[in-house]
C-alpha cells in the first residue's frame, strides 16, 4: 500500500470522525455514496450533512481503521477496501431512537473507488443491527 493511499484513507476517516472540512481533499464533488442514507443528498455536500448529523447523534464519534486492502492498479486507480470500528456515545436522536447515553461500537466495511487520487464512489455496509441491540432497541438473543 502506498503512502498516498494511507494518507487518503486516513484523511477520509478523520473527516467522517467530525472534520467534514477535510472532505474536499479526498472526495470528488459528485462522489457517489452507495447506498444513500434515507434523506441524504448525493455528492460531497451530502457527505457533509451526514457527518454533521452523526456528530449530533454521537459524542466522541471516532472511526478506527483496522484494515486497508489496496487493490488499485499500477496507475493508482481502482478499489480500496477498508474495515473500521466506529465508536461513540449515543447522545442524540438517530433513526428515531432517543439518546440513551450508551457507549456503542459499530463495525463497517467500505469499498472506495479511487480515480486520479480522489474517491469517486463508496459502497458501504454498517452493522446497524448490533447498534440497535447496544442501545436496547432490538432483542440481543
Description of each model-found segment:
Residues 1-141:
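C-terminal and inter-domain tail/linker signature
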Amino acid at each position: 500500500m502506498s503512502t498516498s493511499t494511507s494518507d487518503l484513507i486516513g484523511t477520509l476517516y478523520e473527516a467522517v470522525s467530525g472534520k467534514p472540512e477535510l472532505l474536499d481533499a479526498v472526495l470528488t464533488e459528485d462522489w457517489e455514496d452507495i447506498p444513500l442514507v434515507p434523506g441524504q443528498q448525493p455528492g460531497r455536500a451530502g457527505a457533509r450533512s451526514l457527518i454533521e448529523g452523526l456528530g449530533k447523534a454521537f459524542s466522541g464519534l471516532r472511526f478506527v481503521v483496522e484494515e486497508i486492502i489496496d487493490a488499485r492498479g499500477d496507475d493508482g486507480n481502482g478499489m480500496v477496501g477498508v474495515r473500521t470500528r466506529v465508536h461513540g456515545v449515543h447522545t442524540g436522536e438517530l433513526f428515531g431512537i432517543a439518546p440513551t447515553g450508551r457507549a456503542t461500537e459499530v463495525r463497517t466495511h467500505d469499498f472506495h473507488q479511487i480515480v486520479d487520487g480522489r474517491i469517486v464512489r463508496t459502497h458501504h455496509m454498517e452493522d446497524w443491527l448490533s447498534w440497535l441491540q447496544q442501545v436496547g432497541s432490538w432483542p440481543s438473543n
